[in-house]
């Protein structure tokens, strides 16, 4: 059965870790399409550059990755970005067999997500490994959510330990970021003085 992966994030900015994850997801034979979905107003974040800039950077950072397309669906929804609302919207638009891609850190805290139980009924979860998350803790969280009907696959994808937050801090210190960002994204950030 072919599936559509939902890869959401703030992408503030998109970096090589995101690209690594997308390439790994694209290599999964059952994945037909990957919707890269920038968040409109992340409920837990406030220091975010405009949606227009983040979409432009995503287009540059992820161009050429098989099966990927930038989706503006979440950006066009009213109010704050909640995964459950986005999944309901995608279902109405005919997206069947969605797979929500999240990090191991998110799985461990998934019960804190807004209407998480409803999310579990709407989408399968693909989980990529994250530095600092013990495998035993990850497997325990997986088991607990599966008791609630979740379908969860732990991917053998271990992205580089890089975060958008660290990149923004590094910009403030004028550190070299050539190894963390695609060259055209770095140029775009500098041209628009985003961070």
Question: Which residue ranges define each predicted feature?
Answer:
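Nucleotidyltransferase catalytic core that binds NTPs
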Residues: 1-195
């Amino acid at each position: 059965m072919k599936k559509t992966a939902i890869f959401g994030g703030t992408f503030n900015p998109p970096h090589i870790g995101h690209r690594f994850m997308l390439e790994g997801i694209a290599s999964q034979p059952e994945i037909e399409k990957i919707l890269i979905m920038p968040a409109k107003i992340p409920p837990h974040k406030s220091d975010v550059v405009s949606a227009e800039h983040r979409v432009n950077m995503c287009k540059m950072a992820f161009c050429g990755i098989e099966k990927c397309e930038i989706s503006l669906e979440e950006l066009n929804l009213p109010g704050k970005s909640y995964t459950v609302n986005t999944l309901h919207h995608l279902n109405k638009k005919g997206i069947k067999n969605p797979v929500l891609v999240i990090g191991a850190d998110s799985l461990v805290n998934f019960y804190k997500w807004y209407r998480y139980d409803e999310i579990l009924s709407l989408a399968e979860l693909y989980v990529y490994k994250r530095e600092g998350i013990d495998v035993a803790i990850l497997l325990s969280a997986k088991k607990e959510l599966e008791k609630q009907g979740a379908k969860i696959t732990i991917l053998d994808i271990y992205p580089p330990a890089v975060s958008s937050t660290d990149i923004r801090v590094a910009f403030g210190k004028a550190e070299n970021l050539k190894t963390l960002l695609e060259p055209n994204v770095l140029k775009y950030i500098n041209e628009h003085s985003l961070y």
